[in-house]
């Protein structure tokens, strides 16, 4: 008996020494008795099933003995890529028992996550679309390639979406409700607004992309971290079964206190090939203290105002990857029509929409998308904030003489914010046809794609700074060198001599 007792005590000591950490969240708003449990990366499917069976019996025993918590037990189960885990409501003794399992990585209290946007006045001009396809603020047209995100699926992880709004043209579907409130609609308006910016016919950037609504926040704009993680899990699995994660974008215009579980889930989605656009937060503080904005593998977005300054509310710091329009943005409203909102919540969907646009246009995916956004952007932001490593504002290539087809859509009018408008050509001419003395819309030299064709993938050429384009060789320019021009674009001695006599 003495030997058995010694062995039991030794095993208990080893178990305690190897117990997983129960993380502390002193500055967060926690959900009482609700926890997120993450398993170690080497946990097999069989190990995970065994742990769940053990949890069920342990939890039942503890609850039966104490009967102190209502509606207790497992709520969400996570299982994608390397990440396995679950969330639920458990008493203190059960949590201690869970932490002792050597397959458990950590236990984290469930915290409240909120949207990063707020409603402002209605019927103000939506300037964001025009800004992302022009070199300077103040433009009133949005120039884009006709591919417009076709073939890409965008996941709106938010408050839900009014998928029947006319701006979505039937391209939006309801996906999942992780709030479990039985209310499959957007009672907040936040998710419909952000989705309109991403894929709407009038207010959207990727006007041909599909949208899937994933509700993780309630009608008050808040919800537990456990539901956010479940929404990420669901989105990744849905993407894998419907076109692939490399043709999927996830927008997360939300955030809360720093969460290892939420950051880990976001990182796993990126590792699977999805592009994640995340709002930096609206507290005018270091975004490093917020999740999922602090996750290095996502594209974290700060907000800009109409004059290209950082929005006064926008978070800043080393976590920021890029800026996008976020002040006074007009977009879709549940039930029809439009409304204006401000926040990094409004900036992130500009990035998500542009990501979908570029993925369709150039065939890129995952982490390469954020890098491409930085390449195409303009160094325009003033007062980016302490420790912020970038002042780049997103652009679709139009600011650098880039690749979009000349197919501009007028920016929404203040007097008719919800009227759909068809894209119209921005100037006359023969885009795609080289002819002497006339620059091409959006590109001052031959190479512009024919209408209806996708633009080429190479990086855009610099936009000439003046109407004369002094450093760009094209017919009719002041510094035009015909020999260099012909050798580069056409070649052939017979044709060179004939056209040389014509132009000279």
From Swiss-Prot:
Glycans are attached at residues 233, 251. One of its GO terms (cellular component) is extracellular region. Keywords: Glycoprotein, Hydrolase, Protease, Secreted, Serine protease, Signal, Virulence, Zymogen. The keyword Manganese does not apply. GO terms for biological process: proteolysis. GO terms for molecular function: serine-type endopeptidase activity. This is Subtilisin-like protease 1. It comes from Trichophyton rubrum (Athlete's foot fungus). The gene is SUB1.
């Amino acid at each position: 008996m003495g030997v058995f007792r010694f062995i039991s005590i030794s095993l208990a000591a080893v178990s305690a020494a190897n117990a997983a950490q129960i993380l502390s969240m002193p500055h967060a708003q926690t959900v009482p008795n609700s926890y997120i449990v993450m398993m170690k990366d080497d946990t097999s499917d069989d190990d995970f099933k065994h742990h769940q069976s053990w949890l069920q019996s342990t939890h039942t025993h503890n609850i039966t003995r104490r009967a102190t918590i209502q509606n207790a037990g497992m709520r969400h189960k996570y299982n994608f890529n390397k990440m396995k885990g679950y969330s639920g409501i458990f008493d203190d003794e059960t949590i201690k028992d869970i932490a002792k399992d050597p397959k458990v990585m950590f236990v984290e209290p469930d915290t409240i996550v909120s949207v990063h946007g707020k409603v402002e006045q209605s019927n103000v001009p939506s300037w964001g679309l025009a800004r992302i396809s022009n070199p300077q603020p103040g433009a009133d047209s949005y120039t884009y390639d006709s591919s417009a995100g076709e073939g890409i699926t965008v996941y709106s992880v938010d408050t839900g979406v009014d998928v029947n709004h006319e701006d979505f043209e039937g391209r939006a579907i309801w996906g999942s409700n992780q709030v479990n409130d039985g209310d499959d609609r957007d009672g907040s308006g936040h998710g419909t607004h952000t989705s309109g910016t991403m894929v709407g016919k009038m207010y959207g950037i990727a006007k041909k992309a599909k949208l899937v609504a994933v509700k993780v926040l309630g009608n008050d704009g808040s919800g537990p971290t456990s539901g956010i993680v479940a929404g990420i899990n669901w989105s990744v699995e849905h993407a894998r079964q419907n076109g692939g994660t490399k043709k999927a974008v996830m927008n997360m215009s939300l955030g809360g206190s720093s969460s290892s579980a939420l950051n880990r889930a976001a990182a796993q989605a990126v590792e699977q090939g999805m592009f994640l656009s995340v709002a930096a937060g609206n507290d005018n503080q270091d975004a490093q203290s917020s999740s999922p904005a602090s996750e290095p593998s996502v594209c974290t977005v700060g907000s800009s105002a109409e004059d290209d300054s950082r929005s006064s509310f926008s978070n800043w710091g080393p976590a920021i990857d890029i800026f996008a329009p976020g002040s006074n943005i007009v977009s879709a409203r549940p039930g029809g029509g439009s409304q204006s909102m401000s926040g990094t919540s409004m900036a992130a969907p500009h990035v998500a929409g542009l990501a979908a646009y570029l993925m369709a246009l150039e065939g890129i995916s995952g982490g390469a998308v954020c890098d491409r956004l930085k390449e195409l952007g303009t160094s325009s932001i003033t007062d980016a904030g302490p420790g912020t490593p970038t002042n780049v504002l997103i652009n679709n290539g139009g600011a650098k003489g880039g690749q979009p087809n000349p197919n501009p859509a007028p920016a929404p009018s203040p007097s008719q914010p919800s009227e759909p408008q068809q894209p119209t050509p921005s100037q006359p001419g023969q885009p795609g046809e080289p002819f002497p003395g006339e620059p091409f819309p959006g590109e001052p030299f031959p190479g512009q794609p024919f209408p209806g064709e996708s633009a080429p993938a190479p990086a855009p050429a610099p936009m000439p700074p003046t109407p004369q384009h002094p450093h760009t060789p094209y017919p009719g320019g002041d510094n035009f060198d015909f020999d260099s021009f012909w050798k580069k674009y056409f070649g052939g001695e017979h044709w060179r001599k004939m056209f040389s006599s014509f132009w000279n």
